A protein has these predicted regions:
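Basic/aromatic-rich interaction segments and small domains that mediate binding to polyanionic partners
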Residues: 2-53
Length: 53
């Protein structure tokens, strides 16, 4: 996964789709397209992500 990829969190479907805006090591900062959720971090031990085709 890299900056600009569209992702979603299968364990938290209410978050919807997000875009990776920053990557540090194996952690990714996600800007959620739903303005209600803002930004959050994902990575090992945090939030599971999968790419949106």
């Amino acid at each position: 996964m890299q900056v600009g990829d569209l992702v979603r969190s299968p364990s938290e479907p209410y978050l919807g789709i997000g875009i990776i805006i920053e990557t540090r090591s194996r952690n990714h900062k996600i800007k959620w397209l739903n303005p209600k959720w803002g930004c959050s971090w994902a990575g090992p031990g945090r939030r599971i992500l999968e790419l949106v085709a």
